[in-house]
Amino acid sequence: PFFKRVGSDLYVTKEIKVTEALLGTDVEVPSIEGPKRVTIPPGIKSHGKVRLKGLGVPDTNKGINGDQYVEVIIDIPKRLTDRQKTLLEELKREGI
């Protein structure tokens, strides 16, 4: 897995679908302790972050671990089926 380290905090990205961003979802992400389940809240925006407290790198000066952040990237499909287009048009009429 690819982690970005900033101080004692770790950052990882996770791609999710548009529907998962709108409705919320549970996803598995890597951590230095192994895979972890993370709840992505409904309505999260692309590049929004979810914090995993204490799952970063140990900070020897403070005696605590940093945090891990999961940056959410929303995957916008380039192609839609006719059914998907119809459903999205219905949602558009509903104001979503």
Where are these regions (language model features)?
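Intrinsically disordered, low-complexity linker/assembly segments
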Residues: 1-96
